């Protein structure tokens, strides 16, 4: 895959994802490209879809690696939710029905759960920014699995809400 959207480096691993955001989705089949020890390894949409009952895996936005486990990471997507991964294996596929992620179109949550970015703080809490008008734009998942959401760090702009996220390492 030669389409690249964002990259992130954690230790000796470089992650590259191929998604993107637009008013809707680009509907690019998801691909996580990992460079480690001068070797590329891809996790493709076909591999992921086999593990999640053929739910869509499209428009990957970013990757954040667990600071306590170099093979554990999360992938955000613009439309198909948040994926928790261990190597090539999908551990969890989070959507509006099993997390505090919200969907921009409640009738079509599998296509409009827009998780546009994520970070993990020093306590191991995953923070994610959600792109949609039907709920809080900032959600979190604690290490123990507890989900929550907040909106205290938000500014209203032109009828929409813009989250402002600052995480100290």
Predicted regions and their residues:
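Carboxylate-rich, polar loop motifs that coordinate divalent cations or form catalytic acidic clusters
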Residues: 1-169
């Amino acid at each position: 895959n030669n389409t690249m959207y964002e990259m992130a480096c954690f230790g000796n691993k470089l992650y590259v994802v191929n998604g993107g955001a637009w008013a809707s989705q680009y509907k690019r089949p998801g691909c996580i490209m990992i460079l480690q020890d001068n070797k590329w390894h891809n996790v493709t949409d076909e591999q992921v879809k086999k593990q999640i009952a053929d739910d869509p895996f499209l428009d990957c936005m970013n990757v954040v690696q667990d600071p306590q486990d170099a093979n554990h990471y999360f992938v955000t997507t613009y439309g198909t939710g948040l994926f928790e991964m261990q190597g090539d294996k999908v551990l969890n596929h989070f959507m509006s029905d099993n997390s505090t992620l919200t969907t921009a179109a409640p009738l079509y949550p599998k296509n409009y759960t827009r998780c546009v970015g994520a970070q993990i703080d020093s306590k191991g809490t995953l923070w994610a920014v959600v792109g949609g008008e039907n709920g809080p734009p900032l959600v979190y998942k604690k290490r123990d699995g507890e989900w929550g959401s907040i909106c205290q760090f938000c500014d209203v702009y032109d009828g929409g809400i813009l989250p402002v996220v600052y995480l100290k390492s």
